[in-house]
Amino acid sequence: MKDPRDVLKRPVITERSADLMTEKKYTFEVDVKANKTEVKDAVEQIFGVKVEKVNIMNYKGKFKRVGRYSGMTNKRRKAIVKLTEDSKEIEIFEA
């Protein structure tokens, strides 16, 4: 089993993800090779909450060129995690 801190890279903070937080849905950028079960276990271990559902999206790398040099940006994987009704909220913006 992978270390939970290797599965979750960082939270994704956008206007849409902030709106989803009111519905107990949290967005994270995760490891490209992580599956839904690993994401669920990692969130439950790190934050101490119960996860109801996990949705995962893949983003392919974009083609970029700087002068005569061309290449690709890294591919990414994003997970939206929905918590159960009785679980506490995750404090992403801790003071």
UniProtKB/Swiss-Prot annotation:
<comment type="function">
    <text>One of the early assembly proteins it binds 23S rRNA. One of the proteins that surrounds the polypeptide exit tunnel on the outside of the ribosome. Forms the main docking site for trigger factor binding to the ribosome.</text>
</comment>
<dbReference type="GO" id="GO:0003735">
    <property type="term" value="F:structural constituent of ribosome"/>
</dbReference>
<dbReference type="InterPro" id="IPR013025">
    <property type="entry name" value="Ribosomal_uL23-like"/>
</dbReference>
<dbReference type="InterPro" id="IPR012678">
    <property type="entry name" value="Ribosomal_uL23/eL15/eS24_sf"/>
</dbReference>
<comment type="similarity">
    <text>Belongs to the universal ribosomal protein uL23 family.</text>
</comment>
<keyword id="KW-0699">rRNA-binding</keyword>
<dbReference type="GO" id="GO:0019843">
    <property type="term" value="F:rRNA binding"/>
</dbReference>
<keyword id="KW-0694">RNA-binding</keyword>
<dbReference type="GO" id="GO:0006412">
    <property type="term" value="P:translation"/>
</dbReference>
<keyword id="KW-0689">Ribosomal protein</keyword>
<dbReference type="GO" id="GO:1990904">
    <property type="term" value="C:ribonucleoprotein complex"/>
</dbReference>
<comment type="subunit">
    <text>Part of the 50S ribosomal subunit. Contacts protein L29, and trigger factor when it is bound to the ribosome.</text>
</comment>
<dbReference type="Pfam" id="PF00276">
    <property type="entry name" value="Ribosomal_L23"/>
</dbReference>
<dbReference type="InterPro" id="IPR012677">
    <property type="entry name" value="Nucleotide-bd_a/b_plait_sf"/>
</dbReference>
<keyword id="KW-0687">Ribonucleoprotein</keyword>
<protein>
    <recommendedName>
        <fullName>Large ribosomal subunit protein uL23</fullName>
    </recommendedName>
</protein>
<dbReference type="InterPro" id="IPR001014">
    <property type="entry name" value="Ribosomal_uL23_CS"/>
</dbReference>
<dbReference type="GO" id="GO:0005840">
    <property type="term" value="C:ribosome"/>
</dbReference>
